[in-house]
């Protein structure tokens, strides 16, 4: 009995100590990472003196300009686990940059001749995340999307314009590896692609908060080909790989590490990191602009995102029905050659927040978000 009593006492003390350590860690994370002192919640969907907003979108997380240089293809994001308890259906739509109108894209199903023949799809229910458009060797335009529903896949489409109307023709899919959890994709002209593995899909919300603080490696980048499937790229491991983008000559891959707070230039020939740009915020998606890059970033910490835009938002928001997360954001204009900073644009307490992508089209910079109901734009000549 004495031995049993001591064992039980030891177990109870251990549990109490672990609980106190857990509370202490949460307090430490809050003090060291939560840095937004005041948040002005966004009411309605109206433009202001700086930003023009385009309403009625569902979490327009990633943007890509179409070949006509007029329309923007929008990935209307659903959700990712564990930031959401379950995956949520999203959509693919178009924004007309001339008249500001939105319309959905029609999708026609076809044979799987661009993806993995083993991958099957029976419907057009998607939960899109990162997207990319590129012209294939045969001249056709290909769209790739990271998709989270009903399973984790890369979905491949042919982008078609018929009678001045854009539509999509499904041309295949690729199933993710067993523990695959993707964020963004970058297409090559031969139909292969690069995709960022964020973290193991079984990672808990608490562990994500810890990893955001410790900056430990959580993922890497894959290269997929029809011949060899997924192959992990050497020297791409990092803290939450996020946006990826390929240079026009396909010799360099640009990678954002969200928890690592940096953008890196990866030489595909030497398989090494050649340059890095560091920031205080969270780099998300990357877009190409001639010899330059645009990096959309959240100008706050990961914990701020959880508090104001994540699972705790309903307890923090004055109005739980707030559609647009209001946290500060930034856009960084970088040289492709060495990732040196050309300029940065920072915004707070405006009609947009928590930006994930910055896309330059015809003198305007368009912003998307993973938690909001709008796209915004700014005239670059006025900045």
Task: Indicate residue ranges for each PLM-predicted region.
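Short, conserved, GDST-rich strand-edge loop motifs in beta-rich repeat architectures
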Residues: 74-89, 145-146, 195-216, 296-326, ...
